[in-house]
Amino acid sequence: MNARPLSELVDDGWAAALAPVESQVAQMGEFLRAELAAGHRYLPAGPNILRAFTFPLEKVRVLIVGQDPYPTPGHAVGLSFSVAPDVRPLPRSLDNIFKEYRADLGHPAPSNGDLTPWCEQGVMLLNRVLTVRPGTPASHRGKGWEAVTECAIRALVARRQPMVAVLWGRDASTLKPMLEDTAVIESPHPSPLSASRGFFGSKPFSRANELLAQRGAEPVDWRLP
């Protein structure tokens, strides 16, 4: 991750919103360079670390919070839960998300795991921690990314625009106080360990659209190719 100004890396709105933590982003770049110097790799690839912030801040209407990137090489792309179009098989959490997508909306199974079309409609796919050591989940938790992503969430709330936050799992649910009066959909995480405890049947996609409509906002077209 190069030491470049945020204005060269992210959407202009996000560059302004993240200005209070720009020095923290730079420190995380130093942390990642130290990881490489020590013989450790990190995911996702440098250009994708801040990818969630390349979509316009002012257009965000749904926030889906993940924990940290997929630790499997080739999976993490900088958007929570998403993978590149050529990834097979899908990560099991994403496979469960697609099972609920089909059950909730009645759409056919997507042809691949790329969730970029959601981002293009104002769905922000944000991990609380933006990097991970390959093969070691949560390895970069507590290293400093949380200050950056919490600043981002506060910026979303401060807009006072209609937004729905989708919080999957206990880790994501700890953000609820920060969301103030934002509409929130909570359920267990879609991972195989917890999906059957309330993620399946939670209808997050249709419920998000209902909550957006109640607030006078356009619904999301969740259909994926």
UniProtKB/Swiss-Prot annotation:
It comes from the Bacteria. One of its GO terms (molecular function) is uracil DNA N-glycosylase activity. Keywords: Cytoplasm, DNA damage, DNA repair, Hydrolase. PROSITE patterns: U_DNA_GLYCOSYLASE. It is an enzyme of class 3 (hydrolase). Pfam families: UDG. The active site is at D68 (proton acceptor). One of its GO terms (cellular component) is cytoplasm. Its EC number is 3.2.2.27. Its main location: cytoplasm. One of its GO terms (biological process) is base-excision repair, AP site formation via deaminated base removal. It is found in: Cytoplasm. The keyword DNA-binding does not apply. CDD domains: UDG-F1-like. It catalyses: Hydrolyzes single-stranded DNA or mismatched double-stranded DNA and polynucleotides, releasing free uracil. Belongs to the uracil-DNA glycosylase (UDG) superfamily. UNG family. PANTHER family: URACIL-DNA GLYCOSYLASE. Excises uracil residues from the DNA which can arise as a result of misincorporation of dUMP residues by DNA polymerase or due to deamination of cytosine. HAMAP family: UDG. NCBIfam families: PRK05254.1-1, PRK05254.1-5, ung. This is Uracil-DNA glycosylase. It comes from Mycolicibacterium gilvum (strain PYR-GCK).
